[in-house]
């Protein structure tokens, strides 16, 4: 038999297989991030991978809708694979309105986007994130940003910057310039500020109907600044919003390293459901964008009919793993027991049980390799100790142990295990 053709032996485009070293790295990252969320009182939640298409598309924006994996099920219903967890969480909250608020949930799970695959970007990938539902306080914004930063640091990020903005501040700026009606095209342009030259970003705005002088002023207003400078800038736009920012900056100053934070009015986030504070993280020498979040105070009302403030963030786990260099975790076998014949098998099983009960991983030779081949095998798979159960050793009540890391060999009585 010739087997499958080569292209069918590989996963579908944009997907990946997780072999043990990569999977253990993923598990390590999951443990680091989950520990942070749990320490802040967030509890883990999971939802179906498949959602009603209407639920996914309700407030996603056309660009994201175009990336949804969607199909008809066998009953003819339009369904799709979730592209993030914020929308499913909003749906879950919509029929659990009696939950005590604020709700603090987190997740570490797979999501799907039918996007063009790139280095470090897959169509099936993992997201870690939190959702805080039921609070409009700037303390909630500060808490979510604090969890975000502590998660980055727990993951191993040392060189990073978190850029913060507020969609309300951008809207106030557009209103003062008389171009609020061009909001959507301006947001699209600002979202591409660090991907395209200045002229092209301005062209996107002018091609959408924004006068050239206004487009230039919007671009200039989106320059980075410190949080303290941002308070003054936002106060000039709107006193109420400026007061909110004064409180937020004060709370952040007590909780996080503020030198890692910058205010940047070009950070608007690509999803249409954001309504207030938004933020993104850039990690490492090449400033990889690894995640972000913000406020979505109108989203839950779309599903439940009840106005409910909410905010959260999501981190692209694979991108973060690449940025911090956590891409492989080798997990060697603790013990490999080699026996020469079936007579020693009961002794091998008994010893393996003792070692496993003590928390060790143990494999027993299956009887298909001679000692030389078994030795080559365990070196390839990674093993700490080789235990040899020969007939003469068993007669003396001992086993021979090879420490493969120190390259030492010694005997040990079976009674001492």
From Swiss-Prot:
It holds the Pfam family HGTP_anticodon. It catalyses: tRNA(His) + L-histidine + ATP = L-histidyl-tRNA(His) + AMP + diphosphate + H(+). Keywords: Aminoacyl-tRNA synthetase, ATP-binding, Cytoplasm, Ligase, Nucleotide-binding, Protein biosynthesis. Its EC number is 6.1.1.21. It is found in: Cytoplasm. It comes from the Archaea. CDD domains: HisRS-like_core. InterPro entries: aa-tRNA-synth_II, aa-tRNA-synth_II/BPL/LPL, Anticodon-bd, Anticodon-bd_dom_sf, His-tRNA-ligase, HisRS-like_core, HisRS/HisZ, HisZ. One of its GO terms (molecular function) is ATP binding. GO terms for biological process: histidyl-tRNA aminoacylation; L-histidine biosynthetic process. GO terms for cellular component: cytoplasm. Disulfide bonds: none annotated. It is an enzyme of class 6 (ligase). NCBIfam families: hisS. Belongs to the class-II aminoacyl-tRNA synthetase family. This is Histidine--tRNA ligase. It comes from Pyrobaculum neutrophilum (strain DSM 2338 / JCM 9278 / NBRC 100436 / V24Sta) (Thermoproteus neutrophilus). The lineage of its organism: Archaea, Thermoproteota, Thermoprotei, Thermoproteales, Thermoproteaceae.
């Amino acid at each position: 038999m010739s087997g499958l053709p080569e292209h069918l032996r590989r996963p579908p485009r944009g997907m990946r297989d997780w072999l043990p070293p990569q999977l253990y790295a993923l598990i390590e990252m999951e443990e680091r991030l989950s520990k942070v969320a749990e320490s802040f009182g967030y509890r883990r939640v999971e939802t179906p991978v498949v959602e009603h298409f209407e639920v996914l598309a309700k407030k996603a924006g056309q660009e994201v809708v175009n990336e949804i994996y969607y199909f008809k099920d066998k009953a003819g219903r339009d369904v799709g694979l979730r592209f993030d967890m914020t929308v499913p969480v909003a749906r879950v909250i919509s029929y659990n309105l009696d939950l005590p608020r604020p709700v603090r949930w987190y997740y570490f799970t797979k999501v799907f986007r039918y996007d063009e695959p790139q280095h470090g970007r897959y169509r099936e990938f993992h997201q870690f994130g939190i959702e805080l539902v039921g609070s409009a306080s700037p303390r909630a914004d500060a808490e979510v940003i604090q969890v975000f930063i502590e998660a980055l640091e727990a993951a191993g990020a040392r060189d990073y910057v978190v850029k913060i903005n507020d969609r309300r501040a951008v809207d106030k700026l557009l209103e003062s310039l008389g171009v609020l009606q061009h909001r959507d095209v301006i947001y699209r342009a600002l979202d591409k500020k660090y991907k395209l030259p200045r002229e092209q970003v301005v062209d996107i705005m002018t091609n959408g109907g924004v006068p050239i002088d206004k487009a230039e002023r919007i671009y200039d207003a989106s320059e980075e600044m410190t949080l303290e400078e941002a308070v003054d800038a936002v106060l000039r736009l709107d006193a109420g919003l400026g007061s909110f920012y004064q409180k937020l900056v004060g709370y952040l100053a007590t909780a996080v390293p503020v030198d890692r934070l910058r205010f940047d009015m070009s950070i608007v986030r690509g999803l249409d459901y954001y309504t207030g504070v938004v933020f993104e993280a850039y990690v490492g020498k090449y400033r990889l964008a690894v995640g972000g979040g913000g406020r979505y105070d109108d989203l839950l009302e779309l599903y439940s009919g009840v106005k409910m403030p909410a905010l959260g963030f999501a981190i692209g786990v694979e991108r973060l793993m690449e940025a911090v260099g956590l891409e492989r975790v080798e997990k060697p076998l603790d013990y490999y027991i080699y026996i020469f014949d079936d007579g020693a098998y009961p002794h091998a099983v008994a010893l393996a049980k003792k070692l496993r009960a003590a928390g060790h991983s143990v494999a027993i030779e299956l009887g298909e390799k001679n000692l030389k081949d078994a030795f080559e095998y365990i070196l390839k798979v990674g093993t700490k100790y080789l235990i040899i159960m020969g007939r003469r050793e068993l007669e003396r009540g001992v086993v021979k142990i090879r420490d493969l890391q120190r390259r030492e060999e010694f005997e040990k009585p079976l009674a001492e295990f």
